[in-house]
From Swiss-Prot:
The reaction(s) this protein catalyses: adenine + H2O + H(+) = hypoxanthine + NH4(+)
Gene3D superfamilies: Metal-dependent hydrolases, Urease, subunit C, domain 1
Keyword annotations: Hydrolase, Manganese
Enzyme Commission designation: 3.5.4.2
GO molecular-function term, one example from the UniProt record: adenine deaminase activity
Lineage of source species: Bacteria, Bacillati, Actinomycetota, Rubrobacteria, Rubrobacterales
Cofactor(s) annotated in UniProt: Mn(2+)
Gene (UniProt): ade
Protein name: Adenine deaminase
Family recorded in the similarity comment: Belongs to the metallo-dependent hydrolases superfamily. Adenine deaminase family.
Coiled coil start-end: none
One GO term of the biological process aspect: adenine catabolic process
Pfam families registered for this protein in UniProt: Adenine_deam_C (PF13382), Amidohydro_1 (PF01979)
Domain of life: Bacteria
Length: 606
């Protein structure tokens, strides 16, 4: 990892650390007489102490008194556990709708001291400039933040969707040269492309492997046939898209790392962990990850502390659960020499925990040798980041946003139209395709108030051609006139507008454009707005304020009748055309079938 203020590479500190361990140099920090969670040996060891010199650990043992000098800070850990800081094995910071600095403020008090962050949201909007922005800001925080280079920009192809930028093998190779903290090729979402030999996908994977980096995965087909083997044989060695014990089983059998996800809206751990708890699979290649966490869930539930606690509640041994969130991700990403354990030479990313270990109650966080949080609050000040103008003006919508612009012409004649619709699935990333019959009036498809159907539009907002896709979505549960508009619309992040009232769809869309990006929900005469001006994805405001506004979005959706768990996160995937089964882009409806992707019409064929 590049030196980032507080963090120095090990090769610069070997003599200094050895001298501190001998007692010839004083430690800068000593944590005394705690119970060590040794993730490297699998033990829980009482009466242990840790001596730290600068950003790294010099000594771990029963007594660190020989390392204490006049200026050494000594923390008494009696009655508390000493554990390594948590690492998120797969996370999109942008999904929390807060900037990296605010993300660090939110998660450090919860015990997350680092992670492996795939910034493909902002890269789909701003290309390499966006990725570099995230990297530079991450380097200014106490986090051990390792970034992955977005692999699928766009997630499929420009024939199927319009992103704000396009990334190929040359861009991947360039970004991987930016430093050791650019750790991997991000999740290769175009799994059909990999399986069926897409040239761009394989060239990007090759670029990562040539650079000595790893490639991360995203595989959504059933795991027990030749396609997962083809995916793994292409050099992709980890995946977080499993939803069943069999998914975990087969990923491990194919030599991959299985990442078990518990995000705000993706509740997969309860099922996927059974491969370990019920079938006895070795946990050494199992990771716990969040993928996406909303700002209010960070505030109300937690981050990796919540996921570890949840895994323990499913029957995982507490030490094993800690390994899944510390040592295992560090080993998966080949950085266990720096992070993932409380052992000599590693960064001093250390937690003190109170109560029973299974409760995962973090009372103090040390990051790179500095106490950064205590009692659930930051004690270290983080400097605000100065965001450049190019990332604050990214919403460029061509065409109108009046009520009439949300009319959908009827496909064919007659008084009824049989049309495709996308059915959302609560707490899952995939959708289902279905047929619905709707009335036709004046040549336009109208909604039937007796049916749970909304209109759905995806409108290109990057100034790259002005495409506009139209369709229908079911399963939202709206019981009164309502609409939602958002520039958070994975993964191309165009302007998505849905609703059962053209007037309200127009109002919500205009509010989002006026805010320079964000989310708006219009219900009756009220409109809730969450401005996200940084690339149309994130707010630079304090995370507590963003969480408050995000709660208002959730309340507005519930007032309309949409009661799904963290409904916005599920809704934001309606344009993610790389996922099964049916999604909408600015180019139209895209179906993922056994042979890959295809554009399909709105009307019944034949």
């Amino acid at each position: 990892m590049e030196e980032r203020g507080r963090r120095k590479p090990l090769y610069e500190m070997t003599r200094e650390l050895a001298a501190t361990a001998r007692g010839d140099l004083p430690a800068t920090l000593v944590i005394r007489d705690g119970t060590l969670v040794s993730v490297t040996s699998g033990e829980v060891l009482p009466g242990m102490s840790v001596a730290v010199r600068g950003p790294r650990i010099a000594y771990v043992g029963p007594d660190a008194g020989h390392t204490v000098g006049p200026q050494t800070t000594v923390i008494d850990a009696a009655g508390r556990y000493i554990a390594p800081g948590f690492l998120d094995g797969h996370c999109h910071i942008e999904s929390s709708q807060i900037t990296v600095t605010q993300f660090a403020r939110a998660v450090l008090p919860l015990g997350t001291t680092g992670g492996f962050f795939d910034a493909h949201e902002i890269t789909n909007v701003l290309g390499l400039r966006g990725l570099r922005l995230m990297l530079d800001e991450a380097r200014s925080t106490p986090l051990a933040a390792y970034l992955e280079v977005a692999s699928c920009v766009p997630s499929t192809s420009t024939e199927l969707e319009t992103p704000g930028a396009v990334i190929g093998p040359e861009e991947v190779a360039e970004a991987l040269s930016w430093g050791e903290d650019v750790i991997a090729l991000g999740e290769v979402m175009n799994f059909p492309g990999v399986v069926f030999g897409d040239e761009r996908m394989h060239a990007e994977i090759s670029a990562a492997l040539r650079a000595g980096k790893i490639a991360d995965g995203h595989f959504c087909w059933p795991p027990d046939d030749h396609r997962l083997a083809a995916y793994a044989a292409s050099g992709i060695s980890g995946c977080h898209e499993g939803t069943t014990p069999e998914d975990t089983l087969w990923r491990l059998r194919q030599g991959m790392y299985a990442k078990l996800r518990r995000g705000s809206a993706w509740h997969d751990v309860a099922a996927t962990i059974k491969a370990h708890t019920e079938r006895g699979l070795d946990p050494r290649r199992i990771l716990l990850v969040t993928d996406d966490r909303s700002p209010e869930s960070l505030l109300e539930e937690g981050h990796m502390d919540f996921v570890v606690r949840h895994a323990i509640a499913q029957g995982v041994n507490p030490v094993t659960a800690f390994q899944m969130a510390t040592l295992n991700p560090a080993e998966r990403f080949r950085v266990s020499h720096d992070v993932g354990s409380v052992t000599p030479g590693r960064y001093a990313d250390i937690l003190l925990l109170e109560g029973d270990l299974a409760e995962v109650r973090v009372s103090l966080t040390v990051a790179a040798g500095e106490v950064v949080a205590e009692g659930g609050r930051m004690v270290a000040e983080l400097e605000p980041y100065d965001y450049p103008a190019f990332c604050l003006d990214t919403v460029r919508v061509a065409g109108g946003l009046g009520p009439e612009d949300f009319d959908i012409p009827a496909p064919g004649g007659g008084e009824r139209a049989r049309v495709r619709a996308i059915r959302v699935v609560e707490n899952h990333v995939e959708t289902r395709g279905e047929w619905v019959e709707l009335p036709v009036e004046g040549g336009l498809v109208r909604l039937d108030p007796r049916k749970d159907v909304c209109k759905l539009f995806v409108i290109e907002r990057h100034g790259r051609g002005g495409g506009r896709g139209a369709g229908f979505v079911t399963g939202l549960g709206f019981e009164r006139p309502a609409a939602l508009a958002s520039t958070v619309a994975h993964d191309s992040h165009n302007l998505m507008v849905l609703g059962n009232s053209e007037e309200l769809m127009s109002r919500a869309a205009r509010e989002v454009v006026a805010a320079r990006g964000g989310v708006a929900v219009a219900v009756g005469g009220e409109t809730a707005v969450l401005p996200l001006p940084v690339a149309g994805l994130m707010s630079p405001e304090p995370y507590e304020e963003v969480a408050r506004l995000s709660r208002e979005i959730g309340r507005a959706l519930r007032s309309a009748g949409c009661r799904m768990n963290y409904a916005f996160m599920t809704i934001s995937l309606l344009a993610l055309v790389v996922l099964p089964e049916l999604h909408l882009s600015d180019r139209g409806l895209v179906e993922v079938g056994e042979e890959g992707f295809r554009l399909v019409g709105l009307a019944a064929e034949g």
